[in-house]
Curated annotation (Swiss-Prot):
Main location: cytoplasm
Positions contributing to ATP binding: G8, Q9, P10, C11, S12, G13, K14, S15
Gene from which the chain derives: KTI12
Subunit structure: Interacts with the elongator complex. Binds to calmodulin in a calcium-dependent manner.
GO cellular component: cytoplasm; elongator holoenzyme complex; nucleus
PANTHER family: PTHR12435
A GO BP entry: 5-carbamoylmethyl uridine residue modification
Organism domain of life: Eukaryota
Family: Belongs to the KTI12 family.
GO molecular function terms listed in the Swiss-Prot or TrEMBL record: ATP binding; calmodulin binding
Cellular compartment(s): Cytoplasm; Nucleus
Name of the featured protein: Protein KTI12 homolog
Protein role: Elongator complex-associated factor that is not a structural subunit but rather transiently contacts the complex. Regulates both meristem activity and organ growth; acts as a positive regulator of adaxial leaf patterning. Required for an early step in synthesis of 5-carbamoylmethyl (ncm5) groups present on uridines (ncm5U) at the wobble position in tRNA.
Residues spanning the signal sequence: none
Length: 301
């Protein structure tokens, strides 16, 4: 139905805005599904997630992946994070466009001095905060949204330090109206993004890749289990999967729970790698080769 990107400096009132928006949306209609995606919902700490550029990039990848899995035409997803880089907001906009849903940005425009003060007060209360050096770094790299950019539009602006943030705030009400208004041929003030052929093809290709990887890795697991059962519990050193495919080399017997755990980890790693590199293999043989190489390394180590 919609994707809402919360944007602002650290400690600018974003989480309060996300909570108020979600509550106002749920109050507007009883059959609406609203979900907030943030670092804490994924068990990620603030300082650990922003301590350097590598982990920050990984954080954005994890959040983007979770948004990609969650967006649909039946729910409203609220991304409560810094979303401080315009290129990243563009990526989120592309996800909304590929899903054919509404999109908007809710910007918490809070002066840096107030953000710093709120961060200090949280430290005094023992609440989760940003270390001072991390806070200063994030502030210096913030890219303010611009409503002239399609990925920053429509833009709803809140001023938490001046007006506070409440469920009844006029800007919250305006955003709720935009997100829930019924759209017909006469509607002009609400824009539902339309997927392009390119985005539809990309999502289909990714789905096919994940299907092939899931299928191929399960077949490898089945082959190992069958070979070990035929060996009556004795170690099976080598398992052939057929011509032009690598041989599975086992130094010991491997139980089904361990095999399942290795398979889950492999699929997770392949998905994370595809966020910054090439997509997962689209054919079964390539997926099989990758998984067998991974198993041979992990089991022999």
């Amino acid at each position: 139905m919609a994707l809402v990107v919360i944007c602002g400096q650290p400690c600018s009132g974003k989480s309060a805005a996300a909570a108020c928006l979600a509550a106002a949306l749920c109050s507007s209609t009883s059959d609406l599904t609203v979900r907030i995606i943030d670092e804490s919902s994924l068990h990620l700490g603030r300082n650990d997630s922003y301590k350097d550029m590598v982990v920050e990039k990984n954080l954005r990848g994890v959040l983007r992946s979770e948004v990609d899995r969650s967006v649909s035409r039946d729910s409203i997803i609220v991304v409560d994070s810094l979303n401080n880089i315009k290129g990243y907001r563009y990526e989120l906009w592309c996800l909304a466009r590929a899903s054919g849903i509404r999109y908007c940005v809710l910007f918490c425009d809070t002066e840096v001095d107030h953000c710093r003060e709120w961060n200090t007060k949280r430290q005094e209360k023992g609440e989760p905060t940003y270390d001072n050096n991390i806070f200063d770094d994030l502030v210096s790299r913030f890219e303010k949204p611009d409503r002239r950019n399609r990925w920053d539009s429509p833009l709803f602006e809140l001023f938490p330090s001046r007006d506070g943030v409440m469920e009844s705030s006029p800007v919250i009400a305006e955003a709720v109206s935009y997100l829930t208004k019924k759209v017909d041929s006469k509607t002009r003030d609400v824009k539902v993004l339309q997927p392009t052929i390119a985005t539809q093809t990309a999502r289909t290709t990714e789905a096919n890749s994940l299907y092939e990887m899931d299928k191929a890795t399960q077949e490898v697991i089945n082959a190992i289990v069958e070979a070990q059962s035929c060996g009556l519990g004795l170690p099976v050193n080598k398992i052939s999967l057929g011509p032009d495919l690598p041989t599975i080399c086992l130094q010991r017997s491997v139980g089904l729970p361990e095999l399942r755990s290795l398979r889950r980890t492999f699929i997770k790693l392949a998905g994370q790698y595809s966020l910054s590199g090439p997509p997962p293999p689209a054919d079964a043989d390539s997926a099989t080769r990758m998984f067998v190489d991974y198993l041979n390394r992990e089991i022999s180590s």
